[in-house]
């Protein structure tokens, strides 16, 4: 007995020492060597038993014979059935039959790989001596059996027919290849085949995204143009006196772009059934180190890093081309050369291939209720992150209301004690897991620090009053605190919290970051400079910015240190002293592009501009948006919530410069020059003003609940044909006149199954003929005028790493979508 125990203990150690791959737990129950040897006596190899009994082998069409579905051998009973890629899927049906013991282990008779249906993963039989011996035995039996040993003449005739059909199919393939060589245009518009992708180690998040990008033919077309050597681009001069545009010669694309092009070509042209995207993934890891280490990652973040990385390489190509063009001329002064290069970089009108395919534009419209002045701000996007509300959101909103009430009561008490105090009004998201006791304790500590701060200000004798960051207010008393009104614009990029889950809060002279720590905003005098940096980690807040001014003024999100200059009349001028202070160091520069406004705002700066817009039509859309069922959990409802009309009231009022100028202009102006800012009620809405050729939608299923992250598993309905017109502005740029529909066709889905800690990403991709409308829109800018039905037809496939299976459309629409890929058809 002792020997048996020691032997039983050493077996798992030996198995685990062979490889780091986990051993399948179902080998013992799913493997029956005795039954298998009996079943393999005088057996016909590579023929599905069920198809043979149904007389479907002899009636196969030429197309089905050409596909030649793989046959899987059950290691429990020796049953041979066609794989899941076939039409009948007899091997899978054999496993699904109810039995006392599972028939879960199957062996592929094509490549001799073992698959476990229960684990839904490949089993490496080198890890198990018993499984390896069985596979070797089966291979020997299959090798010893020859067609001559078959006594049935019908089988020989069947094999002869197969050989004849295969020869005919080879001749047809050669004809098709010759036709494709003669007509390269036909080859470009043909359907892209679906191939599996090798898992490099928890890289299913990467494989699922790449499967959908590989089914984007226009991306492959543009990458061919990018790779062309000697590409010359013309850039209009920034100075009107110069009439000739600058011609620049672009360098070869960057390593990430080249790896992407190589991957797409391999997916299209290789004859292998499985592609290993090792080079592309390594280039992504070089751009974003966070994806190293073979950990579970987020598919949407991977997509953003990939697109941003390729776009940055394209911008770098143009910048280097401009610099080389000036180096070849007679320019010698370095300072002048730098200034000219910067001017041309601002003027450059060469959008990258990423923006041409995935780029769209959002327009935020805000209107003052008093003067009805309309102002706009434009912001580009590569994807839209849509909020997903679940049943727990109602409970959280109730807790937020109670928390808000207690915070407002404390603020009222502090106002009675300090008449001249000003408050930092900031919309912030308080984790629901934080207790009220901790909130009150932190509040008291902040008040004590504020008292000490005011004492220091009395000693110094000079007090600075910051009113909404950019304007100066004369302090009536020496006991004034910093007043800042920070407002955040909705982040249409990745990972942000829903607007429903954010309630306005007021804090007394403190700023609270997402980790729950409070940092005081120190008073700044002419003898000291201070910078306060609030780091936002892991989660970015998507609170809506209250607009500080409707006429080309906005509170900066990036203020890197405040420098003060004392005026001649004793006032402190800070309007020209703010530089970029990064309040969100975790985000990339491309993701948030709000800077302080000066006299010469740079391109890309997010500026609210006053426009002569009719207030009656400023918030109109291309199509009626009131026909949606608000109770329905669908992608249309998520878009409706994302673009819903908001009212700025109470603490979220608009600081209107037009109303302020009207109030304090003329004889009403104060002799001392003092002017109080006028806050008014306003209306705000964000709509799509440029519909992208390829629309990418992201459902924010991963949300923060207290100090933890959770996943929302609610099913969201999404259609095959999506009309984006109810969410577009009335003057949408790339929509034909008098068109009231902006139609998109679904061609890709990324699904996340499982939980936050142990989940799996798979892809649904549709093979179809390439859309001529989409190619003309991206390549030539031609707006589609009519509906193209052919682009909506195709075959859906479900891809889980290396395994590809044809599925019906109903299964795609019932999946738990995380990313949706739509292409423009009208």
Swiss-Prot record:
Zn(2+) 2 binds at residues 48, 51, 82, 90. Residues 195-825 form the USP domain. Its main location: nucleus. There is a cross-link at residue 140 (Glycyl lysine isopeptide (Lys-Gly) (interchain with G-Cter in SUMO2)). GO terms for cellular component: cytoplasm; nucleus. The active site is at 204 (nucleophile), 760 (proton acceptor). Keywords: Activator, Cell cycle, Cell division, Chromatin regulator, Hydrolase, Isopeptide bond, Metal-binding, Mitosis, Nucleus, Phosphoprotein, Protease, Thiol protease, Transcription, Transcription regulation, Ubl conjugation, Ubl conjugation pathway, Zinc, Zinc-finger. A zinc finger (UBP-type) spans 22-142. Residues 408-419 have a biased composition (Acidic residues). CDD domains: Peptidase_C19K. Residues 437-457 have a biased composition (Basic residues). One of its GO terms (molecular function) is transcription coactivator activity. The keyword Nucleus applies. It comes from the Eukaryota. This is Ubiquitin carboxyl-terminal hydrolase 16.
């Amino acid at each position: 007995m002792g020997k048996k125990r020691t032997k039983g203990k050493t077996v798992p150690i030996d198995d685990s020492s062979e490889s780091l791959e986990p051993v399948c737990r179902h080998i013992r129950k799913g493997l029956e060597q005795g039954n298998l040897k009996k079943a393999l006596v005088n057996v016909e190899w590579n023929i599905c038993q069920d198809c043979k009994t149904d007389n479907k082998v002899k009636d196969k069409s030429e197309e089905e014979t050409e596909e030649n579905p793989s046959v899987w051998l059950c290691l429990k009973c020796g049953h041979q059935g066609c794989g899941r890629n076939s039409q009948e899927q007899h091997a899978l049906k054999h496993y699904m039959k109810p039995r006392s013991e599972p028939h879960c282990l199957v062996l592929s008779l094509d490549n001799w790989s073992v698959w476990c249906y229960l684990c839904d993963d490949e089993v490496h039989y080198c890890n198990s001596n018993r499984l390896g011996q069985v596979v070797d035995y089966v291979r020997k039996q299959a090798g010893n059996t020859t067609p001559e040993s078959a006594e049935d003449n019908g089988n020989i005739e069947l094999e002869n027919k197969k050989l004849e059909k295969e020869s005919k199919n080879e001749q047809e393939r050669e004809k098709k290849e010759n036709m494709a060589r003669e007509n390269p245009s036909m080859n470009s518009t043909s359907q892209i085949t679906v191939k599996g992708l090798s898992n490099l180690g928890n890289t299913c998040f990467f494989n699922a995204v790449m499967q959908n990008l590989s089914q984007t033919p226009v991306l492959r077309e543009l990458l061919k143009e990018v790779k062309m050597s000697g590409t010359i681009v013309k850039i209009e001069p920034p100075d009107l006196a110069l009439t000739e545009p600058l011609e620049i010669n672009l360098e070869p694309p960057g390593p990430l772009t080249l790896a992407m092009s190589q991957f797409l070509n391999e997916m299209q042209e290789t004859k292998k059934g499985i592609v290993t995207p090792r080079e592309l993934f390594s280039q992504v890891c070089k751009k974003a180190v966070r994806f190293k280490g073979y950990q579970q990652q987020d598919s949407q973040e991977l997509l953003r890093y990939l697109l941003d990385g390729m776009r940055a390489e394209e911008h770098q190509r143009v910048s280097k081309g401009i610099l080389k063009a000036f180096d070849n001329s007679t320019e010698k002064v370095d300072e002048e050369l730098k200034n000219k290069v910067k001017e041309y970089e601002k003027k450059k009108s060469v959008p990258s291939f990423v923006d041409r395919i995935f780029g769209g534009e959002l327009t935020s419209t805000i209107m003052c209720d008093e003067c009805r002045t309309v102002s706009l701000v434009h912001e580009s996007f590569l994807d839209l992150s849509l909020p997903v509300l679940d049943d727990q959101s109602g409970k959280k909103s109730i807790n937020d209301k109670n928390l808000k009430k207690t915070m407002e009561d404390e603020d009222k008490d502090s106002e009675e004690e300090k008449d001249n105090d000003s408050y930092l009004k900031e919309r912030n998201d308080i984790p629901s897991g934080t207790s009220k006791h901790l909130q009150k304790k932190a509040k008291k500590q902040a008040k004590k620090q504020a008292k000490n701060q005011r004492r220091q200000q009395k000693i110094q004798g000079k007090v600075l009053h910051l009113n909404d960051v950019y304007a100066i207010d004369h302090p009536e008393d020496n006991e004034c605190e910093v007043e800042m009104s920070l407002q955040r614009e909705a982040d249409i990029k990745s990972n942000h919290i829903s607007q429903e889950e954010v309630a306005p809060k007021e804090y007394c002279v403190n700023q609270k970051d997402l980790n729950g720590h409070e940092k005081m905003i120190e008073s700044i005098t002419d003898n000291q400079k201070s910078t306060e940096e609030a780091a936002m980690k892991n989660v970015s807040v998507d609170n809506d910015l209250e607009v500080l001014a409707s006429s080309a003024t906005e509170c900066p999100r990036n203020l890197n240190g405040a420098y003060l200059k004392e005026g001649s009349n004793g006032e402190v001028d800070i309007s020209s002293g703010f530089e970029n202070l990064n309040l969100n160091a975790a985000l990339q520069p491309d993701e948030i592009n709000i800077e302080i406004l000066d006299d010469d705002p740079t391109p890309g700066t997010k500026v609210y501009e006053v426009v002569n817009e009719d207030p009656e039509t400023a918030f109109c859309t291309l199509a009626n948006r009131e026909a949606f069922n608000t109770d329905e959990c669908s992608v249309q409802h998520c878009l409706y919530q994302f673009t819903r009309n908001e009212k700025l009231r109470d603490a979220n009022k608009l600081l209107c410069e037009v109303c302020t100028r009207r109030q304090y202009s003329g004889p009403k102006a104060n002799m001392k020059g003092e002017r109080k800012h006028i806050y008014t009620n306003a209306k705000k809405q964000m709509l799509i003003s440029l519909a992208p050729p390829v629309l990418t939608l992201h459902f924010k299923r991963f949300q923060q609940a207290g100090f933890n992250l959770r996943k929302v598993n609610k099913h969201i309905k999404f259609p095959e044909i999506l009309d984006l017109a109810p969410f577009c502005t009335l003057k949408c740029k790339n929509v034909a006149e008098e068109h009231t529909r902006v139609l998109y066709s679904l061609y890709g889905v990324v699904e996340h199954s499982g939980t936050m800690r142990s989940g799996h990403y798979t892809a649904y991709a549709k093979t179809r003929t390439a859309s001529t409308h989409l190619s003309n829109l991206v390549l030539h800018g031609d707006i589609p005028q009519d509906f193209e039905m052919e682009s909506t037809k195709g075959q859906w496939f479900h891809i889980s790493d290396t395994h590809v299976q044809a599925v019906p459309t109903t299964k795609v629409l019932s999946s738990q979508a995380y990313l949706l890929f739509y292409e423009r058809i009208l």
